Each structure stands twice: as C-alpha cells, then as structure tokens.
Design a protein with these regions (language model features):
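Transmembrane-helix bundle of Major Facilitator Superfamily
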Residues: 2-194, 352-355, 372, 380, ...
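Generic alpha-helical transmembrane segments of integral inner-membrane proteins
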Residues: 66, 70, 93, 97-101, ...
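Hydrophobic transmembrane-helix bundles of small-molecule transporters
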Residues: 148, 170-279, 286, 304-305, ...
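Membrane-helix interface residues
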Residues: 52, 82-83, 138-141, 171-172, ...
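12-transmembrane solute porter fold
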Residues: 18-34, 39-41, 234-237, 246, ...
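Hydrophobic alpha-helical interface/terminus motif in multipass membrane transporters
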Residues: 43-46, 132-133, 168, 196, ...
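Intrinsic disorder in cytosolic terminal tails and internal cytosolic loops
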Residues: 1-17, 459-474
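Hydrophobic core positions of alpha-helical segments in small-molecule transporters
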Residues: 60-63, 90-91, 113-114, 126, ...
C-alpha cells in the first residue's frame, strides 16, 4: 500500500517544475513569431539600404518561412531521436546566432542567408517545444490549457513585434530589429536547461534524407518560380516542372516506406485532417501575404513611416490576441470545423475591405485608412478564431499516437501557405505597378483564394472523424 506514495510525491512536485518550464516554452513561441512579424515593417528601409526591388526583398521574408517549412518535420524527428530539450536549446542557439548575422549583414545576400538560418533554428525550436508540452502535461485538460497559453504568446508577439519594430526602426534603424531576439533566446536557453527534463522517443523512427531533399527541392522550385515568373517566364516554367517531378518522387518514396516515412501518407485519407491542412494553408496565405504587401505600400508611397505602420496594424493584432483566448469556447459551441473555416472566411473578407480601400492606402496627399483598418480588424478576428480551432481539429482528427506528426504537418502547411502568400501577392503587387491598382489586385486575389480555401476546408472536413473513433469534428 506504500508503493503509490512515491508517484504522489512526484505529482506534487511536477506542477512546480511545469510552472517554471512553461515560460521557457512560451518564449519559443514569442521569439519565433516576433522574428517573423517584425521584419515585415523593415522591407522598405532594407530595400532602400541595399537598392533592391520587391522580388528580391521577398526573399528576406520567404527565406525564413521556406527554411522553416522545409526543415520542420526533420526538426521534430531530431527531437524525438536525440532529445527534445537538446533540440530546443540548439534551435534557440541557432536562431539567436542568425539574428546576429542579420543585424551585421553587409549585403542583401548575407541578410537572406541569415534569415534562412533563423528559419532552420525555428524548425528545431517549435516542434521541440510542442513535444515537451505533450510530455510534461499528460492530463488532456492540463495539456490543453498549457497549449492555449503557448499559442496565446503568438498573439502577444503579433502586438509587440510590429509596434516594437516600428519604434526601433525609427530610432535606431532597421538593423536594430534583429537584436530583439537575442536576449529572449538567451533566456530561453538558460531556463530550459535548468528546469526542463530531457526526453526522447527514438523507437521505430529514422531519418528519411531522400524525402527531405526532394521536399526541399519541390517547395523551393515552386516558390522561386512564383517570385521570378514575371522576370523570366521560361526559367519559372522549368522550375515548376522540376518541382512537380520532385513531388512525384517524394510521394513514391513515402508510399514505399509506409508508416516509417517522413510523412506517412495514410494520414491524408482522413477527411478532417485534409480539411485542416487546407484551412491552415489558406489562413497564412492571405495573412502573411497581406502583412508583406500592405506595410510596403504604406511606406513606399509615404503614407506612413515604419512606426506609423506598426501602430496602424494594431487593429489586427489586438483582436487576434483577445479572440484567441475565447476561440476554444466558440469551437465548443459551433464545432471546430465551422469555427476554423469561418475564421479563414472572415480573414478573406478583411482582405477584400483592404483591397476596396486601396486608393486611400497609397495616396500620401489624401490618405484614408478606414477601409484598411476595418479590414485589419476583420482579419485579426478571423485569425484569432481560426488558429486555435484548426489546431484542435489537427489533434482530434488523428489517433493520439500520431498527434505529434499531425502538429508538425499543420505547421508545415502554415508556413508553406505563408511562403506562397508573400510570393504570389507580392508578385501581383509588383506586376501591377506597386500603386493602388497593385494593392487592389493583390488583396482581392488573396481574398478570393482565402474564401475559396475556407469553403473547401469546411466541405472537406464535413464528414471527418478521428481515426478509430466515429466522432464529429464540427
């Protein structure tokens, strides 16, 4: 009868350790989101400093997103094989070091390389932090609460990042924004090393280098083709063909490896899971594309400077942070499928409003930002509703044993959507002259694709259930 005493003592001690571990894990969400959001406001001064065009500037954002998306599954596998705390610390170290490279970059090429290195660090950091949450918080309700706090930090970063970035750019120049990550990274490394226990689960797992290389080639070719299509259509067509061939080989290898694959293909037989992927891609496609194009339009037409643009983005950031906390209750009432797809649809309506008011966002003599601010508020509300609801669908649509893989694929899809959003909407803005017409075409195109994605996600997930349990998703 005395055997249970030790577990009870450990259970008493565990919450204290968890309370110390959660801030370290939340810092990971903060620095990854800040490192993404803060750069959007710096595109115009970076372009001025290096004398470059929009197409090249897109790589300052896409290099991070692309490296993150391509390496995310490998980052999660490294944590499973060699230790999640070790992967977390390594990711924070790489991300902090990359920030130093970006801050000191003498050329745009070095800056882009530093951004890619930062994306690689985030690809280690984020899946490791999610896996640590799953290991430390074993009770579903407690784990859900911890993940909710973890996710809310992304909303806080969306408020702090642009505002802080605008202030720093105005006071100290664009290089200063990359220094923000460094102290947070050091704090995360120190706190995680002190309070987070090591864990690993290497059973039945191994690297899939061929699939990883093919995936990188496929994504890289298609994204580069999207950015470069206007300037060299023949090369863009060749890149798209190469990417398609890489995708075909990737699928063939993964099908042969079965459950040992980098991406087990049988996951995609689950309709709810497929719908979640569509919703996540549509969500970040429009959101990240808009956050690249709109601040660039404001600043390049001298409607707002960097600090003014950061304040003008608050109508998006504040609703996102506030709605995120209540998205679980909304999803419980109407279903995660409806809440997630509805949030993406709201974002699409927000982009449409920004497109309608494009003339006021690009006229320095008579600026009128009411349409843009209303659109940003809709976008932020939809984003806050969609993020948590789509994540809940990811966890609920598959067996618990595959929840980690599902979460990694969810983040891959988000970042791929972001890459294509920045590439395509930025290319449309540039191709249409970069003025009011460019902003209007980019935003209305993004709106149409988001609304279509929301409808497709809702329809695809309509009959989805968790594998092995006939449970409706929404």
């Amino acid at each position: 009868m005395r055997r249970p005493a030790a577990p009870r003592a450990a259970d008493v001690a565990a919450p204290a350790r968890h309370r110390l571990a959660l801030p370290a894990l939340c810092i990971a969400a903060l620095i990854a989101q800040i490192d993404t959001a803060i750069v959007n406001l710096a595109t115009e001064p970076i372009g001025t400093a290096f004398g470059t065009r929009v197409g090249a500037l897109q790589w300052a954002i896409d290099a991070y997103n692309l490296a993150y998306a391509v390496l995310l599954l490998t980052g999660g596998l490294i944590g499973d094989l060699y230790g999640r705390r070790r992967a977390f610390v390594l990711g924070a170290t790489v991300l902090s070091g990359a920030s130093v490279v970006c801050a000191l970059a003498p050329t745009l090429g070095v800056l882009i390389a530093g951004r890619a290195l930062a994306g690689a660090g985030a690809a280690l950091l984020i899946p490791a932090s999610l896996a640590i949450v799953r290991v430390l918080w074993r009770h579903p309700a407690e784990r859900a609460r911890a993940l909710g706090i973890w996710a809310a930090c992304g909303g806080i970063a969306m408020i702090v990042g642009p505002t802080l970035g605008g202030v720093l750019i105005h006071a100290l120049g664009w290089r200063s924004i990359f220094g923000v990550v460094i102290p947070f990274g050091i704090a995360a490394i120190a706190l995680t090393s002190a309070v987070v226990p090591e864990s690993a689960d290497p059973r039945g797992r191994r690297f899939d280098p061929a699939a990883q290389v093919l995936g990188a080639i496929a994504i890289g070719c298609v994204v580069f083709a999207t950015i470069d299509a206007r300037h060299d259509p023949q090369r863009a067509a060749l890149l798209i063909g190469t990417g398609a061939a890489a995708i075909a080989l990737f699928v063939r290898i993964e099908r042969r490896l079965g459950t040992a694959a980098l991406v087990p293909l049988d996951l995609f037989a689950n309709r709810a899971f497929r719908g979640m992927l569509v919703g996540n891609g549509a969500m970040t496609f429009g959101g990240y594309g808009m956050l690249f194009v709109l601040p660039l339009a404001w600043q390049s037409h001298h409607v707002l400077d960097a600090s003014g643009a950061s304040l003008a983005l608050l109508p998006m950031s504040v609703p996102f942070a506030l709605v995120s906390f209540g998205s679980g209750a909304v999803a419980a009432r109407v279903g995660a499928r409806t809440a997630g797809a509805g949030g993406v649809a709201l974002m699409g309506l927000g982009l449409a409003a920004i497109g309608i008011g494009a003339a006021g966002s690009t006229n320095p003599h008579a600026p009128m930002l009411a349409w843009a601010e209303a659109g940003l508020a809709l976008t932020g509300t939809g984003l806050g509703l969609a993020v948590g609801s789509l994540a809940a669908t990811a966890v609920g649509a598959v067996d618990a044993a595959r929840a980690g893989t599902a979460a990694s694929l969810m983040n891959v899809t988000r970042m791929i959507g972001a890459v294509f959003g920045v590439a395509l909407l930025g290319a449309l803005y540039d191709a249409c002259g970069g003025g009011a017409s460019g902003l209007r075409v980019a935003m209305l195109t993004g709106s149409a694709l988001q609304l279509a994605g929301a409808a497709l996600a809702w329809r695809t997930a309509s009959t989805g259930t968790r594998a092995g349990a006939p449970r409706p998703i929404g």
